[in-house]
């Protein structure tokens, strides 16, 4: 297969490197505005630098790993020539453009898979399979390493908080995938590293997101950009028959008071989820050849974005927000 990677940042570079080690991939095209970066990524992956037009014409499948504001154009162009696409999350930068692109994708009939690699994580998949019985509670832990404080926000506040759009969107997808239920209501408490309450969505550095699901299950997400020891992503599912955890390992970057301390915690998402990213690519390429179904769809990207918008509104208005309040796309609106 010939595969094009659009965007050669950290995600595009990672995808290119993994593709370069796959026997089924014959050629890799790297499309990137920064010529120096494009050449470096192409050299590491054993690919070649190409124009966007050549990539669309010659590639069998397209991976879009540009900044979110460029996704709509890249994905739209790819599906217009019948290419299957793996698009990094979020599907686009805003709810309105996500609705528009989802409509475009579903009308075109090609498949667009989102980069929700946690669906391919071995521990998450095992936990999902093990959670038999009536599911009562889902707990999601999503802690990113402590980062340098962001500049003070300026201009009008965004529709969706960066922490929800860029990080928690994975968790919003996972809770739907784990349970087979839709999120119906969201409430949020948020914090900052100095202990004060954020007043702008861009100031949120930690949050607790409570979610009511359509089947009666409750879900709680603990999200943070302030973990002092590394990258900690876990799930716990409690039903009337089982209690199952996924994501725990000797490298979970938390000081364990009840047993010896972990000494080599996960440092970031590329290290923690490399096997899942590889499995994601294998499944995507198989689906592109007609040998399976995509693991996720554009509509999954839309639903995750709707939850992120609802969470931001809950923060801003200090109330529970029903998902019915957030614009979406009914099946009848595809044509």
Predicted regions and their residues:
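Active-site loop of classical SDR/Rossmann-like NAD(P)-dependent oxidoreductases
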Residues: 33, 269-282, 296
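Beta-loop-alpha module in the N-terminal Rossmann-like domain of NAD(P)-dependent dehydrogenases
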Residues: 15, 47-102
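Hydrophobic residues in well-ordered beta-strands that form the structural core
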Residues: 64, 87, 112-114, 221, ...
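C-terminal helix-rich "cap/oligomerization" subdomain common to oxidoreductases
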Residues: 61-64, 286-335
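N-terminal Rossmann-like dinucleotide-binding module
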Residues: 1-44
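Predominantly a Rossmann-like dinucleotide-binding segment in NAD(P)-dependent oxidoreductases
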Residues: 118-200, 318
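Rossmann-fold dehydrogenase core element
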Residues: 100-118, 134-140
């Amino acid at each position: 297969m010939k595969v094009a990677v659009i965007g050669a940042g950290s995600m595009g570079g990672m995808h290119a490197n993994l593709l370069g080690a796959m026997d089924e991939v014959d050629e890799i095209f790297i499309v990137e505005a920064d010529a120096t970066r494009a050449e470096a990524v192409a050299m590491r992956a054993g690919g070649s630098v190409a124009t966007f037009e050549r990539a669309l014409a010659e590639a069998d499948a397209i991976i879009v790993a540009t900044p979110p504001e460029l996704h709509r154009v890249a994905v739209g162009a790819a599906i217009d020539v019948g290419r299957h696409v793996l698009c990094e999350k979020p599907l686009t930068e805003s709810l309105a453009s996500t609705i528009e692109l989802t409509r475009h994708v579903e009308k075109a009939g090609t498949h667009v898979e989102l980069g929700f690699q946690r669906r391919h994580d071995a521990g998450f998949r095992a936990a999902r399979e093990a959670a038999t019985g009536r599911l009562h509670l889902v707990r999601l832990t999503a802690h990113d390493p402590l980062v340098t404080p962001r500049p003070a926000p300026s201009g009008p506040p965004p529709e969706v908080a960066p922490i929800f759009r860029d990080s928690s969107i994975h968790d919003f997808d996972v809770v739907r995938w784990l349970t087979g239920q839709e999120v119906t209501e969201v409430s949020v408490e948020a914090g900052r590293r100095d202990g004060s309450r954020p007043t702008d969505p861009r100031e949120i550095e930690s949050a607790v997101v409570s979610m009511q699901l359509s089947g009666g299950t409750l879900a709680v997400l603990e999200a943070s950009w302030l973990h002092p020891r590394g990258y900690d992503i876990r799930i716990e599912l409690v039903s009337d028959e089982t209690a199952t955890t996924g994501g725990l390992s000797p490298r979970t970057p938390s000081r364990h008071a009840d047993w010896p301390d972990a000494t080599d915690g996960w440092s970031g998402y590329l290290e923690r989820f490399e096997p899942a990213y590889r499995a994601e690519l294998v499944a995507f390429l198989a689906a592109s050849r007609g040998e399976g179904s995509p693991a996720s769809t554009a509509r999954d990207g839309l639903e995750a974005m709707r939850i992120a918008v609802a969470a931001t509104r809950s923060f801003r208005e200090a109330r529970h927000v029903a998902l019915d309040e957030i614009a979406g796309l009914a099946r009848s609106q595809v044509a």
